[in-house]
Amino acid sequence: MLIRYVIETDLADITDLMMELGYNTTESEMNIRLSKLNSNPDYHTIVAAIDNQVVGLIGLHLGLAYEFSGCYGRIVCLIVNSQYRKKGIGKQLMDRAKAIVIESGGNTLVLNSGNRTERVDAHNFYENNGFSAKSTGFSKKISSP
């Protein structure tokens, strides 16, 4: 298995992973999103590939904090193909994200996860990897007037 930055030929596999995560999208939409993300140095899209097939993805955003000095990393996306779960792939992706944050001078890694029943396994994974539930997130769709 290879942990590496995303490349153009990963598009179809990434689209499939996003669909598996429950986000309805197309290759064309994902191509536009990835182009924007990849052009911003604060975003890092890392994949796990086995035999040139992307089986996992982690999206990391580096940001500055108001509540402490330095930067932090926010995991904005994490998915491992259901056929490849419980094989250490998610942990390796998390480890790479952690390394990027440390290399950038940060010391905190955060994430949000839905509180739906189907997310219980993900929450257990996060807790087993040292994360602790500390807050409740809120979301609101907005549009211009």
Which sequence ranges carry the predicted segments?
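Helix-loop element at the rim of GNAT/NAT acetyltransferase active sites that forms part
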Residues: 15-28, 66
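Active-site rim helix/loop that mediates acceptor-substrate recognition in acyltransferases
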Residues: 25-45
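Glycine-rich acyl-CoA binding loop
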Residues: 48, 86-94
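Conserved beta-strand-loop-alpha-helix junction that forms the acyl-donor binding cleft
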Residues: 110-121, 141
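Conserved acyl-CoA
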Residues: 92-108
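A short beta-loop-alpha structural element at the N-terminal edge
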Residues: 1-14
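Conserved beta-strand in the GNAT
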Residues: 47, 53-62, 74, 79
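A conserved beta-turn-beta hairpin within the catalytic core of GNAT-like acetyltransferases
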Residues: 63-75, 134
